[in-house]
């Protein structure tokens, strides 16, 4: 894919940051010395970590140069590193590995979570959240449009590249032997957005990218036209004209 767009991502900053706040609230650390924000994006989640633990050394890592540029502008004086978590080795003295909405993009992420949790010292925490929305209309219709147009062959891999998350028990069984305690839960958010066009704008920043990034400009326009029409049919307006984007998310907090 092309580089991530921080500007597009931040169009829904409050809604995207809310799961980070909810994840942060469940972390039982009073004074960690070193905190790493994995997949820090434009620094909105990193900012929460800095606010909660101002005395800690907080580091952000991401693969996107544009996201890292925005993070450095947001939090000057903090360290942000361009790195792929699949090949990244955490510092031996890290007390917290925090990951908001990143591991759904990482191949074989359950094995990666085991590796990272196993690298933490006793009492260290791995806290992560992933969208669990591939069965939601917003994402089902991406795959439907990918399979139905003249681009179907080019988009075939993108349409099947992401699998549904494993059942919660699979995460429990994989991580429990590596930690003293583990908490696993789902939260379903219902984001009130202005209209169905806002839903399309939301997913342009994340879920749509593996599809539209492979298309030529005119094809991209046609794909988005068809996708937008399907979204408009699937999400009916509320009494005030807004639409509710149902968004399930999966959380894990594991204490080494």
Curated annotation (Swiss-Prot):
Catalysed transformations (reactions): trans-aconitate + S-adenosyl-L-methionine = (E)-3-(methoxycarbonyl)pent-2-enedioate + S-adenosyl-L-homocysteine
Keyword tags: Cytoplasm, Methyltransferase, S-adenosyl-L-methionine, Transferase
Pfam family, one: Methyltransf_25
GO molecular function, one term: trans-aconitate 2-methyltransferase activity
One annotated GO biological process: methylation
Enzyme kind, highest EC tier: transferase
Keyword Cell inner membrane in annotation: no
Location of the protein in the cell: Cytoplasm
CDD domains referenced in this protein's UniProt entry, alphabetically: AdoMet_MTases
NCBIfam families: PRK01683.1
Cross-referenced HAMAP family: Tran_acon_Me_trans
Protein name per the record: Trans-aconitate 2-methyltransferase
